[in-house]
Amino acid sequence: TTRAPREGEVDGVSYLFVSDDRFDEMVAQDRLLEWAQVHDHRYGTPRDLVERHIAAGDQVFLEIDVQGALQVRSKFPAAHLVFIAPPSMEELERRLRGRGTDSEESIRLRLANAEGELRLKEEYDECFVNDDVDACLASLIAYVERFSEKKEEDRL
């Protein structure tokens, strides 16, 4: 990402934090599987990292926005896309304000972007509403386990 690290984030763990110039180089060299402009910054997924894990037979999980997810789907049609939705726009706004890390302008931008992203949730294979984090996580884990079991059956 081209954004600055937030408190507690570690380069190479939370994200790879790069300059705008470095990000431009990565795009020009086709080193990103997907990338997108999100909330005034650019985010992307290094292609080599994903391809290494796929080649090793690993399951790959990407936490990316709608733009990036649709790019991944175009390159990997068998990818499973899961959309995590807020229970309501009001709750999303409450959560954003509760973080205490975003300016008023940033919150407005994030809410506007979220409305657009919610209109595209039908492009995903599954949608979970994050009204309770533990329940949402349990549903997501169950979904991944079902998918993993099917992959094992396909290998036999």
Please describe what each predicted stretch is.
Residues 2-5, 66-68, 86-91, 133-135:
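Conserved nucleotide-binding/hydrolysis micro-motifs of P-loop NTPases
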Residues 3-60, 67:
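ATP-dependent small-molecule kinase phosphotransfer cores
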Residues 4-10, 91-94, 100:
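A short acidic, helix-capping loop that chelates divalent metal ions and anchors anionic groups
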Residues 8, 52-55, 73-77, 119-121:
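Conserved catalytic network of the ASCE P-loop NTPase/AAA+ motor domain
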Residues 23, 61, 92, 114, ...:
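Residue-level signature of catalytic and energy-coupling elements of molecular machines
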Residues 60-65, 74-98:
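Conserved phosphate-donor/acceptor-positioning beta-strand/loop module used by diverse small-molecule
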Residues 78, 94, 98-102, 116-156:
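NTP-dependent small-molecule kinase module
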Residues 104-113:
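Glycine-rich S-adenosyl-L-methionine
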